Protein backbone atom coordinates (compact mmCIF):
# COMPACT_ATOMS: atom_id res chain seq x y z
CA UNK A 1 0.00 0.00 0.00
CA UNK A 2 1.42 3.38 -1.02
CA UNK A 3 2.34 6.08 1.45
CA UNK A 4 -0.31 8.49 0.15
CA UNK A 5 -3.04 5.87 0.36
CA UNK A 6 -2.07 5.07 3.96
CA UNK A 7 -2.16 8.76 4.82
CA UNK A 8 -5.62 9.16 3.30
CA UNK A 9 -6.86 6.17 5.33
CA UNK A 10 -5.32 7.63 8.50
CA UNK A 11 -6.88 11.05 7.89
CA UNK A 12 -10.30 9.53 7.19
CA UNK A 13 -9.95 7.44 10.36
CA UNK A 14 -9.10 10.49 12.48
CA UNK A 15 -12.01 12.45 11.04
CA UNK A 16 -14.56 9.65 11.39
CA UNK A 17 -13.64 8.65 14.93
CA UNK A 18 -13.07 12.06 16.48
CA UNK A 19 -16.04 13.75 14.83
CA UNK A 20 -18.24 11.05 16.38
CA UNK A 21 -16.24 11.35 19.62
CA UNK A 22 -16.94 15.10 19.80
CA UNK A 23 -20.65 14.61 19.16
CA UNK A 24 -20.80 12.12 22.06
CA UNK A 25 -18.67 14.24 24.39
CA UNK A 26 -20.92 17.30 24.46
CA UNK A 27 -24.16 15.66 25.65
CA UNK A 28 -22.20 13.29 27.89
CA UNK A 29 -20.64 16.09 29.94
CA UNK A 30 -23.06 19.01 29.58
CA UNK A 31 -26.58 17.51 29.53
CA UNK A 32 -28.73 17.50 32.65
CA UNK A 33 -29.90 13.88 32.82
CA UNK A 34 -33.60 13.42 33.69
CA UNK A 35 -33.60 10.86 36.50
CA UNK A 36 -30.59 12.16 38.42
CA UNK A 37 -31.36 15.81 37.52
CA UNK A 38 -27.63 16.48 37.25
CA UNK A 39 -24.80 16.61 34.76
CA UNK A 40 -22.42 13.68 34.42
CA UNK A 41 -19.48 15.77 35.60
CA UNK A 42 -17.28 12.96 36.94
CA UNK A 43 -14.21 13.90 34.88
CA UNK A 44 -11.71 11.45 36.39
CA UNK A 45 -14.13 8.55 35.96
CA UNK A 46 -14.63 9.49 32.30
CA UNK A 47 -10.88 9.67 31.71
CA UNK A 48 -10.43 6.31 33.45
CA UNK A 49 -12.97 4.66 31.14
CA UNK A 50 -11.41 6.29 28.08
CA UNK A 51 -7.86 5.26 29.02
CA UNK A 52 -8.86 1.68 29.90
CA UNK A 53 -10.57 1.28 26.53
CA UNK A 54 -7.61 2.83 24.69
CA UNK A 55 -5.12 0.59 26.52
CA UNK A 56 -7.01 -2.55 25.44
CA UNK A 57 -7.35 -1.34 21.84
CA UNK A 58 -3.70 -0.23 21.83
CA UNK A 59 -2.59 -3.67 23.00
CA UNK A 60 -4.45 -5.24 20.08
CA UNK A 61 -2.79 -2.69 17.78
CA UNK A 62 0.65 -3.59 19.16
CA UNK A 63 0.00 -7.34 18.86
CA UNK A 64 -1.02 -6.86 15.23
CA UNK A 65 2.35 -5.24 14.48
CA UNK A 66 4.29 -8.33 15.64
CA UNK A 67 7.32 -6.18 16.38
CA UNK A 68 8.82 -8.56 18.96
CA UNK A 69 9.04 -5.67 21.43
CA UNK A 70 6.35 -6.22 24.03
CA UNK A 71 4.51 -3.62 26.06
CA UNK A 72 5.89 -4.89 29.39
CA UNK A 73 9.50 -4.66 28.21
CA UNK A 74 8.92 -1.16 26.85
CA UNK A 75 7.33 0.04 30.09
CA UNK A 76 10.18 -1.45 32.17
CA UNK A 77 12.81 0.36 30.09
CA UNK A 78 11.01 3.70 29.87
CA UNK A 79 8.90 3.76 33.02
CA UNK A 80 10.11 7.21 34.12
CA UNK A 81 9.22 8.81 30.78
CA UNK A 82 5.89 7.00 30.69
CA UNK A 83 5.06 8.11 34.24
CA UNK A 84 5.87 11.75 33.52
CA UNK A 85 4.06 11.96 30.19
CA UNK A 86 1.01 10.08 31.46
CA UNK A 87 0.80 12.32 34.53
CA UNK A 88 0.59 15.51 32.46
CA UNK A 89 -1.88 13.80 30.13
CA UNK A 90 -3.95 12.47 33.04
CA UNK A 91 -4.15 15.93 34.61
CA UNK A 92 -4.96 17.65 31.31
CA UNK A 93 -8.08 15.68 30.43
CA UNK A 94 -9.98 16.22 33.73
CA UNK A 95 -9.10 19.93 33.62
CA UNK A 96 -10.46 20.17 30.08
CA UNK A 97 -13.63 18.20 30.90
CA UNK A 98 -14.17 20.24 34.06
CA UNK A 99 -13.92 23.48 32.09
CA UNK A 100 -17.00 22.42 30.09
CA UNK A 101 -19.08 23.19 33.19
CA UNK A 102 -18.14 26.88 32.83
CA UNK A 103 -17.50 27.51 29.12
CA UNK A 104 -19.57 26.35 26.15
CA UNK A 105 -18.46 23.45 23.98
CA UNK A 106 -17.56 25.50 20.92
CA UNK A 107 -15.32 27.73 23.04
CA UNK A 108 -13.74 24.60 24.48
CA UNK A 109 -13.06 23.18 21.02
CA UNK A 110 -11.66 26.51 19.82
CA UNK A 111 -9.23 26.65 22.72
CA UNK A 112 -8.17 23.02 22.20
CA UNK A 113 -7.42 23.90 18.57
CA UNK A 114 -4.76 26.38 19.69
CA UNK A 115 -1.85 23.96 19.87
CA UNK A 116 0.67 26.73 19.19
CA UNK A 117 0.19 28.39 22.57
CA UNK A 118 1.17 25.45 24.81
CA UNK A 119 4.05 24.58 22.50
CA UNK A 120 5.39 28.14 22.79
CA UNK A 121 5.02 28.08 26.57
CA UNK A 122 6.80 24.74 26.89
CA UNK A 123 9.69 25.88 24.72
CA UNK A 124 10.10 29.18 26.59
CA UNK A 125 9.47 28.05 30.17
CA UNK A 126 10.71 24.45 30.15
CA UNK A 127 13.30 24.14 27.37
CA UNK A 128 14.40 27.83 27.30
CA UNK A 129 14.10 27.92 23.52
CA UNK A 130 13.76 31.39 21.91
CA UNK A 131 10.58 32.00 19.93
CA UNK A 132 10.75 33.68 16.51
CA UNK A 133 8.69 36.73 15.57
CA UNK A 134 6.41 34.72 13.29
CA UNK A 135 5.45 32.33 16.06
CA UNK A 136 5.04 35.17 18.54
CA UNK A 137 2.67 36.95 16.15
CA UNK A 138 0.60 33.82 15.68
CA UNK A 139 0.50 33.40 19.45
CA UNK A 140 -0.93 36.90 19.83
CA UNK A 141 -3.53 36.23 17.11
CA UNK A 142 -4.56 32.95 18.69
CA UNK A 143 -4.77 34.45 22.18
CA UNK A 144 -6.85 37.37 20.93
CA UNK A 145 -9.19 35.08 19.02
CA UNK A 146 -9.76 32.81 22.01
CA UNK A 147 -10.43 35.81 24.24
CA UNK A 148 -12.91 37.27 21.73
CA UNK A 149 -14.83 34.03 21.43
CA UNK A 150 -14.81 32.96 25.07
CA UNK A 151 -15.66 36.36 26.56
CA UNK A 152 -18.07 37.42 23.81
CA UNK A 153 -20.66 34.67 24.20
CA UNK A 154 -24.33 35.44 23.85
CA UNK A 155 -25.25 33.83 27.17
CA UNK A 156 -22.74 34.70 29.84
CA UNK A 157 -22.53 32.87 33.10
CA UNK A 158 -21.22 34.58 36.21
CA UNK A 159 -17.97 36.40 35.56
CA UNK A 160 -15.98 34.37 38.05
CA UNK A 161 -17.24 31.09 36.63
CA UNK A 162 -16.37 32.09 33.06
CA UNK A 163 -12.89 33.23 34.05
CA UNK A 164 -12.45 30.06 36.07
CA UNK A 165 -13.42 27.95 33.06
CA UNK A 166 -10.98 29.86 30.86
CA UNK A 167 -8.27 29.30 33.46
CA UNK A 168 -8.92 25.56 33.50
CA UNK A 169 -8.67 25.52 29.71
CA UNK A 170 -5.31 27.30 29.83
CA UNK A 171 -4.00 24.79 32.38
CA UNK A 172 -5.15 21.94 30.16
CA UNK A 173 -3.49 23.50 27.10
CA UNK A 174 -0.16 23.90 28.90
CA UNK A 175 -0.27 20.29 30.07
CA UNK A 176 -1.05 19.25 26.48
CA UNK A 177 2.07 21.10 25.37
CA UNK A 178 4.21 19.21 27.87
CA UNK A 179 2.63 15.93 26.81
CA UNK A 180 3.09 16.46 23.07
CA UNK A 181 6.69 17.64 23.34
CA UNK A 182 7.67 14.71 25.55
CA UNK A 183 5.88 12.15 23.37
CA UNK A 184 7.67 13.37 20.27
CA UNK A 185 11.05 13.27 22.01
CA UNK A 186 10.51 9.71 23.29
CA UNK A 187 9.22 8.40 19.96
CA UNK A 188 12.30 9.64 18.10
CA UNK A 189 14.88 8.75 20.75
CA UNK A 190 17.61 6.35 19.50
CA UNK A 191 17.02 2.91 21.02
CA UNK A 192 18.14 -0.68 20.54
CA UNK A 193 14.55 -1.65 19.71
CA UNK A 194 12.24 0.53 17.65
CA UNK A 195 9.61 2.43 19.63
CA UNK A 196 6.31 2.66 17.77
CA UNK A 197 3.16 4.65 18.28
CA UNK A 198 1.45 1.50 19.54
CA UNK A 199 4.00 1.22 22.38
CA UNK A 200 3.21 4.76 23.47
CA UNK A 201 -0.52 4.18 23.20
CA UNK A 202 -0.49 1.09 25.42
CA UNK A 203 1.98 2.39 28.00
CA UNK A 204 0.55 5.87 28.39
CA UNK A 205 -3.06 4.76 28.66
CA UNK A 206 -2.14 2.02 31.15
CA UNK A 207 -0.36 4.59 33.30
CA UNK A 208 -3.32 6.98 33.04
CA UNK A 209 -5.60 4.19 34.29
CA UNK A 210 -3.34 3.72 37.32
CA UNK A 211 -3.10 7.47 38.01
CA UNK A 212 -6.87 7.90 37.94
CA UNK A 213 -7.54 4.78 39.99
CA UNK A 214 -5.13 6.04 42.65
CA UNK A 215 -6.83 9.43 42.67
CA UNK A 216 -10.34 8.00 42.91
CA UNK A 217 -9.42 5.53 45.65
CA UNK A 218 -7.23 7.82 47.76
CA UNK A 219 -8.71 11.27 47.29
CA UNK A 220 -12.16 11.18 45.69
CA UNK A 221 -14.11 8.03 46.47
CA UNK A 222 -17.35 9.99 46.29
CA UNK A 223 -16.76 10.57 42.56
CA UNK A 224 -16.50 6.83 41.93
CA UNK A 225 -19.66 6.15 43.92
CA UNK A 226 -21.47 9.09 42.35
CA UNK A 227 -20.56 7.90 38.85
CA UNK A 228 -21.96 4.42 39.43
CA UNK A 229 -25.10 5.77 41.08
CA UNK A 230 -25.78 8.18 38.21
CA UNK A 231 -25.15 5.47 35.60
CA UNK A 232 -27.65 3.27 37.42
CA UNK A 233 -30.21 6.09 37.57
CA UNK A 234 -29.68 7.17 33.95
CA UNK A 235 -28.50 4.14 31.93
CA UNK A 236 -28.78 6.23 28.73
CA UNK A 237 -25.46 7.81 29.76
CA UNK A 238 -23.77 4.47 29.02
CA UNK A 239 -24.51 4.81 25.31
CA UNK A 240 -22.71 8.15 25.11
CA UNK A 241 -19.90 6.97 27.40
CA UNK A 242 -19.30 3.83 25.33
CA UNK A 243 -19.34 5.80 22.07
CA UNK A 244 -16.98 8.40 23.55
CA UNK A 245 -14.50 5.77 24.78
CA UNK A 246 -14.63 3.54 21.69
CA UNK A 247 -14.21 6.39 19.21
CA UNK A 248 -11.44 7.95 21.27
CA UNK A 249 -9.54 4.66 21.44
CA UNK A 250 -9.85 3.96 17.72
CA UNK A 251 -8.93 7.56 16.96
CA UNK A 252 -5.74 7.23 19.00
CA UNK A 253 -4.65 4.35 16.76
CA UNK A 254 -4.84 6.62 13.72
CA UNK A 255 -3.18 9.50 15.59
CA UNK A 256 -0.19 7.44 16.75
CA UNK A 257 0.08 5.82 13.32
CA UNK A 258 0.26 9.25 11.68
CA UNK A 259 2.77 10.52 14.24
CA UNK A 260 4.98 7.47 13.71
CA UNK A 261 4.95 7.32 9.91
CA UNK A 262 4.56 10.99 8.96
CA UNK A 263 5.70 14.35 10.26
CA UNK A 264 4.24 16.15 13.25
CA UNK A 265 3.24 18.93 10.82
CA UNK A 266 0.98 16.51 8.96
CA UNK A 267 -0.62 15.37 12.20
CA UNK A 268 -1.06 18.95 13.45
CA UNK A 269 -2.72 19.97 10.19
CA UNK A 270 -5.12 17.02 10.32
CA UNK A 271 -5.91 17.62 13.99
CA UNK A 272 -6.57 21.33 13.59
CA UNK A 273 -8.83 20.90 10.57
CA UNK A 274 -10.68 18.10 12.34
CA UNK A 275 -11.33 20.36 15.31
CA UNK A 276 -12.53 23.12 13.00
CA UNK A 277 -15.09 20.73 11.54
CA UNK A 278 -16.03 19.55 15.05
CA UNK A 279 -16.81 23.10 16.11
CA UNK A 280 -18.92 23.82 13.04
CA UNK A 281 -20.67 20.46 13.42
CA UNK A 282 -21.46 21.28 17.04
CA UNK A 283 -23.00 24.58 15.96
CA UNK A 284 -25.17 22.86 13.33
CA UNK A 285 -26.22 19.77 15.33
CA UNK A 286 -26.81 21.34 18.74
CA UNK A 287 -28.00 24.77 17.53
CA UNK A 288 -25.45 26.94 19.34
CA UNK A 289 -25.93 30.65 18.79
CA UNK A 290 -22.77 32.55 17.92
CA UNK A 291 -22.44 36.34 18.05
CA UNK A 292 -20.62 38.28 15.31
CA UNK A 293 -17.76 39.05 17.71
CA UNK A 294 -17.39 35.32 18.32
CA UNK A 295 -17.23 34.63 14.58
CA UNK A 296 -14.49 37.25 14.44
CA UNK A 297 -12.65 35.33 17.15
CA UNK A 298 -12.99 32.10 15.18
CA UNK A 299 -11.67 33.78 12.02
CA UNK A 300 -8.72 35.30 13.90
CA UNK A 301 -7.73 31.96 15.43
CA UNK A 302 -8.14 29.95 12.25
CA UNK A 303 -6.37 32.67 10.25
CA UNK A 304 -3.39 32.53 12.59
CA UNK A 305 -3.25 28.73 12.56
CA UNK A 306 -3.57 28.50 8.77
CA UNK A 307 -0.96 31.23 8.30
CA UNK A 308 1.48 29.37 10.54
CA UNK A 309 0.84 26.12 8.66
CA UNK A 310 1.51 27.82 5.32
CA UNK A 311 4.72 29.39 6.66
CA UNK A 312 5.94 26.00 7.88
CA UNK A 313 5.18 24.48 4.49
CA UNK A 314 7.13 27.25 2.74
CA UNK A 315 10.10 26.77 5.06
CA UNK A 316 10.01 23.01 4.44
CA UNK A 317 9.92 23.51 0.66
CA UNK A 318 12.81 25.97 0.86
CA UNK A 319 14.95 23.53 2.82
CA UNK A 320 14.25 20.72 0.32
CA UNK A 321 15.22 22.95 -2.66
CA UNK A 322 18.46 23.88 -0.92
CA UNK A 323 19.30 20.20 -0.45
CA UNK A 324 18.81 19.61 -4.19
Curated annotation (Swiss-Prot):
It holds the Pfam family UAA. It is found in: Endoplasmic reticulum membrane. Keywords: Endoplasmic reticulum, Glycoprotein, Membrane, Sugar transport, Transmembrane, Transmembrane helix, Transport. GO terms for cellular component: endoplasmic reticulum membrane; Golgi membrane. The keyword Ion transport does not apply. The chain crosses the membrane at residues 7-27, 42-62, 106-126, 135-155, 161-181, 199-219, 237-257, 265-285, 290-310. GO terms for molecular function: UDP-galactose transmembrane transporter activity; UDP-glucose transmembrane transporter activity. Glycans are attached at residue 97. It is a multi-pass membrane protein. Signal peptide: none annotated. Belongs to the nucleotide-sugar transporter family. SLC35B subfamily. May be involved in specific transport of UDP-Gal from the cytosol to the Golgi lumen. Involved in the maintenance of optimal conditions for the folding of secretory pathway proteins in the endoplasmic reticulum. This is UDP-galactose transporter homolog 1. It comes from Eremothecium gossypii (strain ATCC 10895 / CBS 109.51 / FGSC 9923 / NRRL Y-1056). The lineage of its organism: Eukaryota, Fungi, Dikarya, Ascomycota, Saccharomycotina. The gene is HUT1.
